[in-house]
Amino acid sequence: MKHYSVLKNEMIQALDCLKEDSILIDCTLGFGGHTIGALQAYPNIEVYAFDKDIYALNLAKERLKPYLQNIHFCHNAFSQFLDIVPNVVLPRVRGIIADIGVSSMQLDETQRGFSFVSSTLDMRMDTRADLNATKVINTYSPIRLEEIFRIYGEVRQSKKLAEIIAYERKKKPFSSCLELSTLIEQHFPRVGGIHPATLAFQALRIEVNDELGELKRLLHNIELAFDEGKIASCRVGIISFHSLEDRIIKQCFKQWSKSCICAEESLRCECGNNHAKGQILTKKPIIPTPQEIAQNKRSRSAKLRIFELKSSKDKGV
């Protein structure tokens, strides 16, 4: 199985803060590419590897057999890391990485209900979850569908798409991605080489897996762990694939870097001007090289942002 870990070298370079007894939290293990790269570069670290997708987790376990003594596999949502990683080892966490979004193997596996030609309409990364794409498409109101397509997919004709789906499902409920993608292709023209169902499928996947909510909870829990002193100095590197995710990460990192947290209308600082949690290490996001994009076209929209959390001790305060 061919697999490409997006921005792998750039992510590993960002982890040069790892020491011999450090812990790395890989929030999105996938096929294990970033974890393998980290363990090859820093062989004595310990990794807590998260993935909601049991299929991906089992494949990764096979691929990571040479490193099993260094890895704790966690079949959990990455936002739950504070409940899974023992408090006693949290101070050793020096890196937290995430590669947000669907993997190539999920897209290419037609039985998972992610691809345009899938015979199912599922899109769950965690098959234990109740909500799937079939329920969204066949039971959500046209108004709610329009919101999902417009907000999560930034679909230009979101209202038209929602109305077409609502009309067609009265005749026969949708049961496969192929049916849905074919319908979209019939009513909406291709733009360049991009399939007209791409953004609609993105929106459905985000809704089914609560992807933006998961990302926000992850960032909140990282901040919480840092503020409570459970995590000290640590690098946070997150790869995103569309503007909604990137905006959340960018705004969060910007907030973390602020020394002054007074209201904007304040005439002078009254907060002490010492609230920065660290510094942004990527003024502009790191993007794939032309060579990487040529090798893996799905990497073309990837952006990596890195933040360095610094405890008062490491700041010299």
Curated annotation (Swiss-Prot):
GO biological process: rRNA base methylation
InterPro entries: RsmH, SAM-dep_MeTrfase_MraW_recog, SAM-dependent_MTases_sf
Reactions accelerated catalytically: cytidine(1402) in 16S rRNA + S-adenosyl-L-methionine = N(4)-methylcytidine(1402) in 16S rRNA + S-adenosyl-L-homocysteine + H(+)
EC number: 2.1.1.199
Cellular compartments annotated: Cytoplasm
Chief localization: cytoplasm
Cited Gene3D superfamilies: Putative methyltransferase TM0872, insert domain (1.10.150.170), Vaccinia Virus protein VP39 (3.40.50.150)
Residues bound to S-adenosyl-L-methionine: 32-34, 51, 78, 99, 106
Keyword Nuclease tagged: no
Alphabetic keyword roster: Cytoplasm, Methyltransferase, rRNA processing, S-adenosyl-L-methionine, Transferase
A cellular component term, taken from the record's GO annotations: cytoplasm
Extent of the signal sequence: none
Pfam families attached to this UniProt entry: Methyltransf_5
Gene Ontology molecular-function annotations: rRNA (cytosine-N4-)-methyltransferase activity
Family: Belongs to the methyltransferase superfamily. RsmH family.
Family annotation (HAMAP family): 16SrRNA_methyltr_H (MF_01007)
Its job: Specifically methylates the N4 position of cytidine in position 1402 (C1402) of 16S rRNA.
Record's protein name: Ribosomal RNA small subunit methyltransferase H
Record organism: Helicobacter hepaticus (strain ATCC 51449 / 3B1)
